[in-house]
Every structure is written in C-alpha cells, then in structure tokens.
Design a protein with these regions (language model features):
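Nucleic-acid endonuclease domains
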Residues: 1-48, 52-56, 65-175
Length: 175
C-alpha cells in the first residue's frame, strides 16, 4: 500500500467530471500495484470510491478533485477511517490525508449537536397546523453543507502547515 500511496502523490491533476478521470487514474494505480479492490462499493453517489482488500483489511479510498486548493464536501463531512486522495488543478498536484486529520472529533460533535438542535426546531414548526395544512404541499428540510472558510493557511491543502504530516501518516500507517 505504501508504494501505491507514494505513486498517488506523484499524480497530476485530473478532474472528476462525468468521465471520472481522477478516479480512473487511481483505479489504474490500483491495477498497476496488483491490489484487489471494489469500485463504488456503496453506489456511485456514496463514499467511498474504492474498497481495497489488503492484508486482511478493507481500506476505504475517496477521490477528490478540484480546480481550487481545497476539496468540496457538500453535504458529506469527511468520513472517519477513509483515506482521501485529493487532486488540485491550481497546483497540478495530489495530496493524501485521513479524514480525521482534517476534521477533529470535537468539531464533529459540535456539528452533531447543532444538527440535532436544528432538527428539533424544524419538528416544532412541522407540528403546527399552518405548516401541515399547506394546500400547495410546500415543505422544508435542513440540509448540511460543509464548507471551509478562512485564509489559505487554513484552507489550502497544499500550503497547509500539516500537509506533510498528513501525508506521512497515510504513508507510514501499518497497512
């Protein structure tokens, strides 16, 4: 696995558009290294992109690609235990990290608390007659949207002070 990840770090930027170029180059690397894997184990719109079977373990890989130096997560917070392989057009480079290296457990707890509180507020309003008796069927739901903001020191995955530490954690993990 270590050699696979070393090669992944050498990959140039590829978009993950309809053709899934970034995922395809990762799949080519998996084949090159003779690794057994299953693509899209949870379906094409769910994480991870690959399950790799190695030394009796299943390793989850998620491919991210962006023209910017930070990935877009949309409604899905980076999943713990998953290795992210992120390619950026801005630098024409790839980096690696574990989800838990970019989102702390404490931050995850805060997000969970926030979502529970906002869902309780929504349920309170949904119980009102005015809400239930809408003759046009309008409804509302809360949608999580995880973004990153701040200066490049915080959000640029390629210039971040912990980039090398994150990559080394992936490379040196006991696969």
């Amino acid at each position: 696995m270590k050699e696979f990840f070393k090669d992944a770090l050498k990959l140039p930027y590829k978009p993950n558009n309809e053709v899934r170029e970034h995922e395809n180059q990762i799949e080519d690397l998996l084949k090159k290294h003779g690794l057994k894997y299953k693509p899209q184990p949870n379906g094409p719109q769910q994480s991870p992109d690959f399950h790799v079977n190695h030394n009796g373990k299943v390793i989850s890989l998620e491919c991210k690609s962006s023209k910017d130096p930070k990935p877009i997560y949309n409604g899905g917070l980076p999943k713990k235990g998953v290795v992210y392989i992120f390619s950026s057009k801005k630098y024409n480079e790839t980096t690696l990290y574990f989800a838990e290296d970019v989102v702390s457990d404490k931050k995850r707890e805060l997000y969970d608390e926030y979502l529970m509180e906002t869902n309780q507020i929504l349920k309170k309003y949904q119980a009102l007659d005015e809400w239930k008796n809408d003759d046009r069927g309008f409804h509302f739901y809360n949608r999580s949207m995880y973004t990153q903001k701040g200066n490049a020191e915080k959000t640029d995955y390629f210039k971040h002070e912990n980039r090398k530490r994150c990559e080394q954690r992936v490379l040196n993990y006991k696969w």
